[in-house]
């Protein structure tokens, strides 16, 4: 899910890796959500999402999961039919399948077996490092906070 993907990305962030604990992560998430919700009450969502200072102050990169705002900006410049949206979990599940669909969408010739084999040999990027897995899964309470925060944004994304 988006929340799990967010956790993976925050854990792999170099700034976080050495100082993060489950308790620290839960605290940072709570404070960040409060900061963004306060901003959303006083400013436009777009301003809050693009506010680099807010992002740096919050300590947790919540804005990276607010995809619909970024897509809305892209759609205001380019036609929607020029976009092919890929879910991270689909990409992770089957890289080759995803690229076949992208090639088809772009009207490119399908991959040959050599290129398919090469794609399957590429190591996965942005995965949790071994030392970071020692921290374990995020707390259920933290997960629920993030799910609650992202839910309305994910609903807008689906529209």
Swiss-Prot record:
Catalyzed reactions per annotation: dermatan 4'-sulfate + n 3'-phosphoadenylyl sulfate = dermatan 4',6'-bissulfate + n adenosine 3',5'-bisphosphate + n H(+); chondroitin 4'-sulfate + n 3'-phosphoadenylyl sulfate = chondroitin 4',6'-bissulfate + n adenosine 3',5'-bisphosphate + n H(+)
GO cellular component: Golgi membrane
Keyword tags: Glycoprotein, Golgi apparatus, Membrane, Transferase
Pfam families with a match to the protein in the record: Sulfotransfer_1
InterPro entries given in the database record: CS_Sulfotransferase (IPR052654), P-loop_NTPase (IPR027417), Sulfotransferase_dom (IPR000863)
Residues with glycosylation annotation: 42, 112
Top-level taxonomic group: Eukaryota
Remaining remarks: In contrast to the human protein, it does not transfer sulfate to the unique non-reducing terminal sequence GalNAc(4SO4)-GlcA(2SO4)-GalNAc(6SO4).
Protein name: Carbohydrate sulfotransferase 15
Gene from which the chain derives: GALNAC4S6ST
